[in-house]
Amino acid sequence: MDEQLKQSALDFHEFPVPGKIQVSPTKPLATQRDLALAYSPGVAAPCLEIEKDPLAAYKYTARGNLVAVISNGTAVLGLGNIGALAGKPVMEGKGVLFKKFAGIDVFDIEVDELDPDKFINVVAALEPTFGGINLEDIKAPECFYIEQKLRERMNIPVFHDDQHGTAIISTAAILNGLRVVEKNISDVRMVVSGAGAAAIACMNLLVALGMQKHNIVVCDSKGVIYKGREPNMAETKAAYAVDDSGKRTLDEVIDGADIFLGCSGPKVLTQEMVKKMARAPMILALANPEPEILPPLAKEVRPDAIICTGRSDYPNQVNNVLCFPFIFRGALDVGATAINEEMKLAAVRAIAELAHAEQSEVVASAYGDQDLSFGPEYIIPKPFDPRLIVKIAPAVAKAAMDSGVATRPIADFDAYIDKLTEFVYKTNLFMKPIFSQARKDPKRVVLPEGEEARVLHATQELITLGLAKPILIGRPSVIEMRIQKLGLQIKAGVDFEIVNNESDPRFKEYWSEYYQIMKRRGITQEQAQRAMIGNHTAIGAIMVQRGEADAMICGTIGDYHEHFSVVKAVFGYRDGVHTAGAMNALLLPSGNTFIADTYVNEDPTPEQLAEIAVMAAETVRRFGIEPKVALLSHSNFGSSNSLSASKMRETLERVRERAPDLMIDGEMHGDAALVESIRNDRMPDSPLKGAANILVMPNMEAARISYNLLRVSSSEGVTVGPVLMGVSKPVHVLTPIASVRRIVNMVALAVVEAQTTPL
């Protein structure tokens, strides 16, 4: 490790506070009553319930989402036996990964005990605390004995990740690699370098999936493991000892091998050995940080080889984070008493299948220009693929149920998958009523920036989720090329329609219609013709206006107001409305907050604000939320007579005329809007109850400042929008920072609006 990296790592662990984890309360402790409920005397109630029924611990405590990462520090990474305390940073790091990828809480426990039986007693005594045990960095062969005995004694999952995590990912890689090279697992020969925990676990899984034991040759530090090589050979090694053929070295047995599995050390495999392997060999060189052979060296002599390593700087990284958080997620969610072979195999298959799926936009963004289509350079998913939890956890949970180790079976797997999706997309629960309605009658939605990678990823999502019938504007050759490069599985003419912006035969009709709309706005016929080639938003707008599309989502490129000016000119306002407005939703840990008008009107009049407030309430109801509107100002219920304050008071009067049943009040300060007790101190009889969820600002400046401050102040907050209100057709203008998920969300909203919009 170079000095710069070393110092950066030390600083990372020291500042701003030492370590990487902390305990945060999940219940409020703001009042004396809170304290009485959390501790004495109230805490006695759940204690007595658990005494009557031990399973009640999962209902009243955090046990069901709590895993112990336990180590004695005898085999820490590549550092060896450095002791329990020195291994603590690794155990904390494991805890961070559990939390980050699967929402699982972790206590890291470092046990200063080398005697296996004493270590077992310590861990077994902790069973009442945890929902699962993750054994970490314990040397072989003791790790096999420790895990076996703990599995026998404990009634919660016990999982030695160094064995089974590596085995699960490696096995998934081998299954997919064999599929690429069209070989059968029952026919291939495999040579293994290393006979430690990971290697043995890999072989066990592969045999369970059909690999023949007689086709496996294992080499350890003494050479080939064969029957009779030594007395009292460890059982784990003896299980894979072959008949004595006279061959003693890796170099001798590698000839003709289809697979090399390396769980040993650096530079064990040479180029000369690789040359002797079978057609299209698979090489899993998993030693870290330096593998058994570097991929460029192997490729130099065997360009047909498929290579996996444990490193992130080469394709096909075998990384345990691909599985352990999600295996535990599935096991915990059904109250599994063990992680058995059926659950491991379910994880293998789920991981292997995910590599065949279309690429996630998160992965594409994280890995830049890499080709992430299934093939020799991509046979296992990337660690940052957000879909891992949605694919692996349900598969593991179902396997636990089917194999009889689940104590709390899942009754509704669709609801369970929806819940898991919240780990991937924080907007999932918020958007659920919109998605459900959109699926009932998907509409044609035109996406003018059809060549954009985000739009293409969104199109894939829309098709997968069954939310819409996308129409993309762009050059067909460019769209097809980018779909292939992004590893997507959508097909033009099957999943979506393309409107070629350079040569669509309808363009004469389009520009003629556009000219009729714009001719009194300074647009000539020639300019209208050019708009049909260069202004994709204009093309999409005319398609919606002609009934060739039902809705439009634009704005992922360019300036908001340029897009909006086209939308406003083509569509105008809906009946009974004389203005438009934009609203953004902020999904914060404290609740959902909607802010208007964030984009359209710089200094709206009371009449405009009243229309915006009423339209905002209508939109919020679509999400299944009761609107509670606060009109914000520097003035608090008449404390100022400034023009701004007077404007908001007049707005309130106009809203009450338009929507007398709407829960609304103002003008008020922001804290009064969000905290009922503060509001009641000033206005005890306010009709607004609880925290306001729609904040109507006096002008765009205040709205935009508030929105951006709230957006960046919460690391857990996510946004939806901007939602365009008041236009006669279901159209929304996004901004260039819109994510793929935001595009998907807004398309779904536009579909729901189109379902109720007259043609």
From Swiss-Prot:
Its EC number is 1.1.1.40. One of its GO terms (molecular function) is acyltransferase activity. PROSITE patterns: MALIC_ENZYMES. It catalyses: (S)-malate + NADP(+) = pyruvate + CO2 + NADPH; oxaloacetate + H(+) = pyruvate + CO2. Residues 429-759 are annotated as: Phosphate acetyltransferase. Its cofactor is Mg(2+); Mn(2+). InterPro entries: Aminoacid_DH-like_N_sf (IPR046346), Malate_Decarboxylase (IPR051674), Malic_enzyme_CS (IPR015884), Malic_N_dom (IPR012301), Malic_N_dom_sf (IPR037062), Malic_NAD-bd (IPR012302), Malic_NAD-bd_bact_type (IPR045213), ME_PTA (IPR012188). One of its GO terms (biological process) is malate metabolic process. The active site is at Y39 (proton donor), K94 (proton acceptor). NADP(+) binds at A195, G196, A197, A198, N288, N320. It is an enzyme of class 1 (oxidoreductase). SUPFAM superfamilies: Aminoacid dehydrogenase-like, N-terminal domain, Isocitrate/Isopropylmalate dehydrogenase-like, NAD(P)-binding Rossmann-fold domains. A divalent metal cation binds at E136, D137, D162. The keyword Chloroplast does not apply. Pfam families: malic (PF00390), Malic_M (PF03949), PTA_PTB (PF01515). In the N-terminal section; belongs to the malic enzymes family. In the C-terminal section; belongs to the phosphate acetyltransferase and butyryltransferase family. This is NADP-dependent malic enzyme.
